[in-house]
């Protein structure tokens, strides 16, 4: 696990096909661009329809490095690496009346140093735990990350799924500790929090709560895509509203609840979403899950979009993700949660190395981009010299600034290639048609989209799945143009046609620059010429006569008073 992020990023070189990267930042930039693009095209979609790969902190991290403060560095590296969905087990200790991360209580005969990591045993398993390491410690790290990425270009949504358990001290359930020794487990009662609400206090200003959702649902209204989602049972705000208007970053909900009602504080349910219907959580043990993908109808797609939110699939030691199943779950509209200790990847059939695991799976976790996309281009095109005669060759990397949908996902393609266009129906985001004719990305009519449809890009995993279904049903062939490009600014992918502006960097082409400055230049030139002419040919009789008059008056005055030279 040492130097995890460096290994993680370095190993991704091969995945993205970087032949001669000058430094690690080049590779990181590719991942950042892929993540930011997927976020940007989903900005108008409700947050419940967003999908991002996640990990179980317990299995992937704590079981390997221990339940201690040294794991905070790894958590930050995972956040910086782009992971947005997290699963975390919490334990309610009846002896201390506090919540803790360690899956075992701390006996009284252990060291009294709360900052020391010690081995504790529970239910015939050993755990390496630090008493002072609590949920609040983890949330402080999340807050630090939120503050450092609280900009329009870097802001993102983080989800945390909690599994809630408690310790059963009864002798019949636990063969390690007898019930009479219960009092020995109150030693570290000062560590941890008695309520979940207080455990999340450090991120309370950025946490989206059930009360926030209730307030939003009372005031929301919309048209277009918003009007479609307004009919949802859980009417969530869009990512744009959530991140850029409400300035929220985090949403938490309970995946599994095994604690009695008495363990919950009065405000816990006002902080965390406990509703069982809030999130659609599935498990790889359900063999029928993937069978339902690939044959969905429009009604099925609309049902998922309106009545299914935060779709996640969690694996386990018995049925871990495989390279094939992982990608299928992603394209099927699920957020895969890594919850096994070992995985099979090419050339390593059973690895436990988290850097190897994430290096392989993370680039394959985008529902939008195909694995390895958007690939690094050694040259960037200047739009002022974007000439079809120069860039028509499909091998020209400088023209690969427009995006097509292919069977594997979004792929950068030559803007001057001729393909058909993806046309989306207004106010019905899961209805697609493929244009009649093929043309370049710069076409004015976008292949003659049918009436009521317009050239667009899928904005969610369900939308892109429905588009794939339309391609299959219509018998069309890939690739298909989608409304996404980075023509104006390299690596800033935008929708709205070939000349849409990047929201993070304004650009002006050479031709447009001439158009902007030409009028001012002409006016300034005329003014300079007029001033020059005035200086040369100026004749001012009034001023000349005034000078003559005063000169004559002074001379006459001097004669009358006899002034000759300077008086002594």
UniProtKB/Swiss-Prot annotation:
It is found in: Membrane. Glycans are attached at residues 23, 68, 94, 109, 174, 193, 197, 230, 339, 382. Disulfide bonds: none annotated. GO terms for cellular component: membrane. The keyword Transmembrane helix applies. It comes from the Eukaryota. Residues 21-512 are extracellular. Residues 534-568 are cytoplasmic. Residues 1-20 form the signal peptide. The chain crosses the membrane at residues 513-533. Keywords: Glycoprotein, Membrane, Signal, Transmembrane, Transmembrane helix. It is a single-pass type I membrane protein. Its main location: membrane. Belongs to the MTC6 family. May be involved in telomere capping. PANTHER family: MAINTENANCE OF TELOMERE CAPPING PROTEIN 6 (PTHR35518:SF2), MAINTENANCE OF TELOMOERE CAPPING (PTHR35518). This is Maintenance of telomere capping protein 6. It comes from Meyerozyma guilliermondii (strain ATCC 6260 / CBS 566 / DSM 6381 / JCM 1539 / NBRC 10279 / NRRL Y-324) (Yeast). The lineage of its organism: Eukaryota, Fungi, Dikarya, Ascomycota, Saccharomycotina.
